[in-house]
Curated annotation (Swiss-Prot):
Name recorded for this polypeptide: UDP-N-acetylmuramate--L-alanine ligase
UniProt KW DNA-binding keyword: no
Function according to Swiss-Prot or TrEMBL: Cell wall formation.
Originating organism: Acidothermus cellulolyticus (strain ATCC 43068 / DSM 8971 / 11B)
Protein family according to the UniProt entry: Belongs to the MurCDEF family.
Catalysed transformations (reactions): UDP-N-acetyl-alpha-D-muramate + L-alanine + ATP = UDP-N-acetyl-alpha-D-muramoyl-L-alanine + ADP + phosphate + H(+)
């Protein structure tokens, strides 16, 4: 999808006009959730993905007709196609759909169709979208609102990334990667931060800012924008929106924040802090997820939910119950005093935030990290920044880049990234064979250490159980 201001004026298509809908790339976090809501609302759904997964199994159990592999034969009785951004537009299935004149919708257009008619909350930002969206959902659930939601990761068991609730509110993670978040209808918007990313789509940071400006310009009369004033990019977006007359609620640690995080105490098991709104302390929050970044995410959730009229006391209870989303610094197990966590971080800022939190959780133990870069272009663009972020660990195993269908770029390979990590040579290794990574990690870790597997997808997501097996072989015989 190219940059187009008309995107922000697109009207969602009514579900009843879509007919039988086929999701190409249905195994993705965002796609699978939307498919579930389609099914909940009586829309016949089929779908396909490149590999079998627990997500596909859960969709079948929910009533979808799901197959493995891409094949134009899947389109025999289809009225509408929804395409994942992860699936190249040249995929034969999509090419044949267009040849036949079938509507081919981006994921966000399908999401807009299920959000229509609800009081939408759209959570956007370069980092923290999934966790912040999840926190807003948990808080609203504790308040008895039964919101509908679509999130990019499960909150527990497979299929828990989406729900068609009975309440009037729909909470959605808004993906800025291709500007399709401009299709979403909403009452309140959240911008957690704005940094350079997705430079395969955007020309530069200025183009990213322009997209976010158009996104927040969609806040309607009576709605509001919540933005992190601690982040320079989000503050720029908020300032311009305020000058246009948008109601803006800033959050953060800065004295200029309308909803302010104060007295932050980071702990091994999470954090404690107070929240003040317009100068008045609302009360204290206790989180079960670690890191200063998660305290900020929770403050955003407070700003949204209290802004929607819900009581802080119940919001705080909901946030206290939040234990995280899948692959967001998610504990995987422990062997011989060595704990294993898995995380989705795939941008230098995310890696640094996760490793700072992990350092507190490690409580004196060392950090041993396996990282799989995602996309050659991102690795080349941010190689130096990736190196600096990974240097917050004690030992690092860099895997080959996960970039299906892409051509390697100079400076964008796993080997180039490993060379950019400013740690002693023995502390960094490039391992091109993902199946060898578990033994590398097991050999480097010792009791008291914390292992973190990191990356957006591909092979790294398969590692945690294999790492635990390798640790058992080494430490338990």
């Amino acid at each position: 999808m190219t940059s187009d201001q008309s995107l922000s004026h697109h009207e969602p298509l009514p579900l009843e006009r879509l007919g039988r809908t086929h999701f190409v790339g249905v195994g993705g976090g965002g796609m699978s959730g939307i498919a579930r809501i389609f099914l909940s609302r009586g829309v016949p759904v089929s779908g396909c993905d490149a590999r079998e997964s627990r997500v596909l199994a859960a969709l079948r159990a929910f009533g979808a007709r799901v197959t493995v592999g891409h094949d134009p034969a899947h389109l025999s009785d289809v009225d509408t196609v929804v395409a994942s951004t992860a699936v190249p537009p040249t995929t034969p299935e999509l090419a044949v759909a267009r040849e036949r004149g079938l509507p081919v919708l981006p994921r966000a257009a399908a999401l807009a169709s299920v959000m229509a008619g609800r009081r939408g909350v759209a959570v956007a930002g370069t980092h923290g979208k999934t966790t912040t969206t999840s926190m807003v959902v948990r808080a609203l659930q504790r308040c008895g609102a039964d919101p509908s939601f679509a999130i990019g990761a499960d909150l527990g068991e497979p299929g828990s990334n989406a729900h068609d609730g009975t309440g009037s509110i729909f909470v959605a993670e808004a993906d800025e990667s291709d500007e399709s978040f401009l299709l979403l209808p909403f009452h309140a918007a959240v911008v957690t931060n704005v940094e350079a990313d997705h430079l395969n789509h955007y020309a530069d940071l200025a183009a990213i800012h322009a997209a976010f400006d158009r996104f927040v310009a969609k806040v309607p009369d009576g709605g509001f924008l919540v933005a992190c004033t601690d982040d320079p990019g989000a503050e720029e977006i908020a300032s311009r929106a305020a000058r246009r007359g948008t109601v803006v609620r800033r959050y953060g640690t800065s004295p200029r924040a309308d909803v302010r995080l104060v007295d932050l105490r980071l702990e091994v098991a999470g954090s404690r802090f107070a929240v003040a709104m317009d100068g008045t302390v609302l009360g204290e929050l206790q989180l079960r997820v670690p890191g200063a970044h998660n305290a900020l995410n929770a403050t955003a959730a407070v700003a949204v939910t209290v802004g929607l009229g819900f009581p802080f006391s119940e919001v705080a209870e909901g946030l206290a119950d939040f234990t995280g989303a899948r692959r967001r610094f998610q504990p995987q197990g422990e062997v011989a005093g060595i704990r294993v966590f898995d995380d989705y971080a795939h941008h230098p800022t995310e890696i640094a935030a996760t490793l700072r939190a992990a350092r507190v959780v490690a409580d004196g133990g060392r950090l041993v990290v396996a990282f799989q870069p995602h996309h050659y272009y991102r690795t080349a663009d941010f190689r130096t920044e990736f190196g600096a972020a990974l240097a917050l660990a004690d030992e690092v195993v860099v895997m080959e880049v996960y970039a299906p269908g892409e051509t390697p770029l100079p400076g964008g390979t796993g080997a180039a990234l490993a060379a950019a990590v400013p740690l002693p040579g023995s502390a960094v290794v490039f391992e091109p064979s993902w199946s060898a990574v578990p033994e590398h990690l097991a050999a480097r870790a010792r009791p008291g250490d914390l292992i973190v597997t990191m990356g957006a997808g591909g092979d790294v997501a398969l590692l945690p159980p294999l790492v635990l097996d390798a640790l058992r072989r080494r430490w338990q015989g």
